[in-house]
């Protein structure tokens, strides 16, 4: 037991002593994020070999696409991935012990006149990943990229006319689901800027692109039509302040980068009303889903809502990003995504509890209790320690920015729960220092970390 623990602890340290870095920004990204990354892999029972494999891929193929290391005063590309505009986030599927991370690829051209809205860096990032693992298929990615993100002419026009103000500038992200020592790749696409360029709403763009795809791939058409019918019914109902029937707005779309016969399309909808009735409506598609599996999942949603002690109310996304180091004083809207499975006439929902801004210790305790009730004993015993050890120098009882979302779905008589976590300046690195940057001495003296 002691030997195993020592081996786990050595993964980050061993790699830190082994790696060379192309520049100081990449060195800082590694020491800021890798301690928590390794800790979550350990918590999820990845083998030593898999930990080395995934952390090595992260260092070699991901960190070079995270851009400059964020500071409070330095210029950087702001990513919609987190409220702090940082382009990297870890998440953990607690039911299956699967680690995922998401990032927005950034390169030297991002934000410049060559690529003012970060349209093209993702292609360079994809090439690195394709070279490292076979089986990545870009057919559906290429289709949605063309339909939902800017082309070169649109990008130049928006930039020259100064038409982009407070809109979401992020257009695409990548995520790696880590399964064993391999990864499964997916993409997330935000059509906000395409909407500005074309004059079409985000809703029109998302549903229009999937409708065209469903005409060719008829196996997803019934599920898409049911989802479209639900959204249309929600959006034509008059809204009152005390109603859960607020309009649903499309926010983004995702798909797996595998063969189209296996890829899943997910449509994400924003729900401004944070309430249990609103979440129940999202889960059942307004009563369209009423099978036994739906009912069983609904009971767990109610259980989670109570354990988390969610505060109801009508929410909106604040426009500016939070400055690095700011303690949040906000609560965000809810969200749901709907998976369109091949040959399944009913969309599969996944609902999101937006817990950013809530006390992290209370959220952790609620999750641990849920894990224990449902006999996820290994995760129940490790989860709190994992987060404490990821931020060892902080008063964890007072934090309220570590958990961003908790997602829940239920399929094949089994619940799936994932947490999305603040993944910046972890381990021995102070998260929010008094100065402009943690370990400022390290930035000046490159010998403090190899």
From Swiss-Prot:
Substrate binds at residues 100, 186, 188, 264, 266, 268, 350, 352, 416, 420. Coiled coil: none annotated. Signal peptide: none annotated. L-tryptophan binds at residues 80-81, 89, 190, 251. Pfam families: Trp_DMAT. The keyword NAD does not apply. Pathway: Alkaloid biosynthesis; ergot alkaloid biosynthesis. GO terms for biological process: ergot alkaloid biosynthetic process. It comes from the Eukaryota. Its EC number is 2.5.1.34. Keywords: Alkaloid metabolism, Transferase. It catalyses: L-tryptophan + dimethylallyl diphosphate = 4-(3-methylbut-2-enyl)-L-tryptophan + diphosphate. It is an enzyme of class 2 (transferase). One of its GO terms (molecular function) is tryptophan dimethylallyltransferase activity. Catalyzes the first step of ergot alkaloid biosynthesis. Ergot alkaloids, which are produced by endophyte fungi, can enhance plant host fitness, but also cause livestock toxicosis to host plants. Belongs to the tryptophan dimethylallyltransferase family. Homodimer. This is Tryptophan dimethylallyltransferase 2. It comes from Epichloe coenophiala (Tall fescue endophyte fungus).
